[in-house]
């Protein structure tokens, strides 16, 4: 099993950190003592929550010093920040690749996939695990009324929306 601190020892920078999934992944890594920061094109409720959690967020572009850059598929692969990261030989990961790396750090993974109902099903699983007293980290692809988009009580299970 991989460790977060070894896998991301040079920090992680998120391009598009204000999205529902990216902000949850940023909080998850920050909770595991990984240096995290990022940027987004616009302010959102998620960027405000990240700042409240102590994660630096820039609106617009800035210099990237972290060793790993994560971007969403919504970001143009020829975007200036990604081109600069390639030139600096940084490790580039899509959100999906990062999600796979994070899942590899857990002994048990439950991933909800499909066309409709993923967020609802993932949220329901999070509630089931909470009420069953099971140690789980939950990456929810939307806003659960109780948990928001991220919830963690332990590292035995990783619940995620694929």
Please identify what each model-predicted range represents.
Residues 1-46, 51-56, 87-90:
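ATP-dependent carboxylate-amine ligase
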Residues 4, 28, 51, 59, ...:
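Phosphate-binding loop of NTP-binding sites
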Residues 11, 67-68:
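Structural motif
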């Amino acid at each position: 099993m991989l460790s977060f601190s070894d896998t991301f020892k040079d920090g992680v920078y998120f391009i598009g950190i204000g999205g529902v999934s990216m902000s949850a992944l940023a909080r998850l890594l920050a909770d595991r003592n990984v240096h995290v920061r990022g940027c987004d094109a616009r302010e959102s409720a998620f960027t405000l929550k990240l700042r409240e959690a102590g994660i630096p967020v820039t609106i617009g572009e800035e210099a990237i010093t972290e060793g790993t850059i994560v971007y969403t598929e919504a970001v143009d692969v020829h975007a200036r920040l990604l081109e600069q990261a390639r030139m600096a030989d940084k490790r580039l990961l899509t959100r999906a690749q990062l999600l796979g790396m994070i899942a590899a750090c857990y002994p048990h993974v439950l991933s909800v996939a499909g066309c409709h109902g993923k967020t609802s099903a993932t949220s329901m699983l999070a509630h089931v695990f909470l009420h069953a007293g099971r140690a789980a980290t939950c990456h929810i692809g939307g806003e659960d009324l109780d948990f928001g988009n991220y919830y963690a009580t332990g590292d035995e299970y990783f619940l995620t929306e694929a």
